[in-house]
Amino acid sequence: MQQAQQKPFIPTIPAYQALKLDEDLINKCNYSIEQLMEIAGTAVAQATTHYIESTSSVSKAGVLVVCGPGNNGGDGLVAARHLSSGSMSSATVRVWLPKEPSSSVNKRMLSIAKHAGVVFIKDTNEEALHAILEFINSCESFYLVDAIFGFSFHGGPIKPPYDTVINTLLQMQTSMAIGPKTRIVSVDVPSGWSVDAQEWGLNTDKELIPDGLLRPDALISLTVPKNCSLWLPPGTAHYLGGNFLTPLLAMEYDVQEIQHYWSGVSSLFVVLS
């Protein structure tokens, strides 16, 4: 895959602009939500594959895609479908679906994934958690794709069943048995993080992520990185997926530099760091 030459500056946007940009892509550029989700999810699958290939062997990898209730979860459903085929088909892929989707678009993406043969683990009960643990133990290397919350999450208490999900992921990451072989790949925003991370303080040590939050090994930003990506610790892999920006939108949001990253790129993602 071709990748853009490394650029020194990566623009970011706050949560309110991320929401408006999504609306503009639909209302001004006439994308459908299904088109955005399909392209974003495919980009997530490609970037995840690249990350796995750079850190392990695909044939030895197990991938668990954790899908939330909103568009981020829909992106995860698309990503899981693509990760289960093509160059990733030798890996073992599962989807953890803590709760059935309520939106019509996510229901359609779920139906497509089921017809494609994607294997699901549903609910957050003891049986589901046991199935997840068995899956992890069967994998030589384990990758968790965090597609739970996107830029609409503004921090604060997490409601059931996703509080159980986040606590489970935190336990995985810190477990003596599972942690060393676990890598977390977050989609757009690490779940549980405030999109703008304002409460962390702009002048604090950015390596000090508050306790009780996920520490992703890789982040796949979509369209334009969000402000919270500035708090990624050194060494975190950072990808950009979804080449949706038009020149006019790039100017309107003052993120023209993003378009330079896509110059000469044929894949649906680029490596930022």
UniProtKB/Swiss-Prot annotation:
Class of this enzyme: isomerase
GO molecular function: metal ion binding; NAD(P)HX epimerase activity; nucleotide binding
InterPro entries (alphabetical): YjeF_N_dom, YjeF_N_dom_sf, YJEFN_prot_NAXE-like
Positions that bind (6S)-NADPHX: 71-75, 150-157, 162, 188
Reactions that this protein is recorded to catalyse: (6R)-NADHX = (6S)-NADHX; (6R)-NADPHX = (6S)-NADPHX
Sites where the protein binds K(+): N72, D146, S191
Recorded family membership: Belongs to the NnrE/AIBP family.
Function comment: Catalyzes the epimerization of the S- and R-forms of NAD(P)HX, a damaged form of NAD(P)H that is a result of enzymatic or heat-dependent hydration. This is a prerequisite for the S-specific NAD(P)H-hydrate dehydratase to allow the repair of both epimers of NAD(P)HX.
Protein name: NAD(P)H-hydrate epimerase
Organism: Giardia intestinalis (strain ATCC 50803 / WB clone C6)
